[in-house]
């Protein structure tokens, strides 16, 4: 489908990760258009049904960009009793509501000649929302330029600053997960003619993500490599010459005696075998 913003035909896949560990929950291929509320809830409902069945006492927080900020998703989260904190697209009404705080931030920045970041919260109801929701507003002046940000959430027992900086901004880690998946594993290679074929390719890339993530987080546990990206792991550890011997019950890999990461490889194999 043609996407006017990107000025080309493209897909816009959905990536869902566990926000602390980076474990992949699911990836689904989508047409290149903005996600509708019913589409988002159909995906999230299947995930939440499974999570709440397996871990009924686990507290779940949905964190995402503004594509997920729809009344259907808000109602879904409230229905499941889970927290949500989602980016909210800026519009003229939100901009007007945040203007007094932005003017204060601009005045403070002019006085101190330093970047200023202020926070506030207020109730807001878009035309498509059946009821108002809490908006967290960040008014920031950096290098003389305004940088407003809005977030919608149902979490009320935290300060606006904490909600934005400690909870919402932590979604930046998910960008690293997506980069590992899309860039380093090249999961954006969707050049097949059929949609189903491209979805299958995405599943294969997702399987590769799970494999490398397991090596990174379990195999490399206790080493400095747990924070390395997938590109570094592939180039330095895996893309090396080796002799492969297939036997009746096992496959043996013979590395060169000068292989520089022998100790790391032993650690990875030991950790994977004992986990």
Regions found by a protein language model. Give the residues of each.
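Gly-rich Lys/Arg/Thr-decorated short loops/hinges at beta-loop-alpha junctions or inter-strand turns
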Residues: 20-32
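Short, conserved catalytic/metal-binding motifs centered on acidic residues
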Residues: 22, 60-69, 84, 151, ...
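Short, surface-exposed basic-aromatic patches at helix termini and helix-loop junctions that form
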Residues: 74-83
């Amino acid at each position: 489908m043609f996407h006017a913003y990107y000025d080309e035909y493209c897909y816009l896949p959905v990536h869902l990760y566990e926000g602390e560990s980076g474990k992949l929950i699911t990836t689904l291929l989508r047409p290149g258009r903005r996600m509708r509320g019913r589409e988002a809830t159909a995906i999230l409902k299947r995930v939440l049904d499974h999570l709440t069945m397996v871990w009924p006492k686990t507290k779940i927080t949905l964190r995402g960009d503004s594509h997920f900020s729809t009344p259907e998703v808000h109602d879904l989260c409230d229905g499941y009793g889970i927290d949500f904190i989602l980016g909210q697209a800026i519009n003229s009404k939100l901009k007007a509501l945040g203007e007094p705080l932005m003017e204060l931030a601009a005045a403070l920045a002019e006085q101190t000649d330093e970047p200023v970041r202020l926070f506030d919260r207020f109730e807001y109801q878009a035309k498509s929302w059946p009821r108002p929701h809490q908006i967290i507003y960040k008014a920031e002046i950096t290098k003389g330029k305004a940088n407003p940000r809005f977030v919608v959430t149902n979490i009320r027992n935290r300060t606006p600053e904490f909600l934005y900086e400690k909870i919402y901004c932590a979604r930046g880690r998910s960008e690293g997960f997506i980069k590992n998946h899309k860039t380093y594993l090249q999961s954006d290679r969707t050049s097949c003619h059929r949609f189903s074929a491209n979805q299958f390719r995405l599943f294969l890339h997702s399987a590769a993500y799970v494999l490398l993530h397991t090596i990174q987080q379990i195999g490399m546990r206790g080493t400095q490599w747990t924070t390395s990206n997938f590109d570094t792991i592939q180039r330095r550890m895996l893309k090396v010459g080796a002799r492969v011997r297939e036997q009746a019950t096992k496959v043996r890999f013979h590395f060169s005696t000068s292989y520089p990461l022998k100790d790391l490889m032993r650690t990875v194999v030991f950790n994977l075998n004992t986990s």
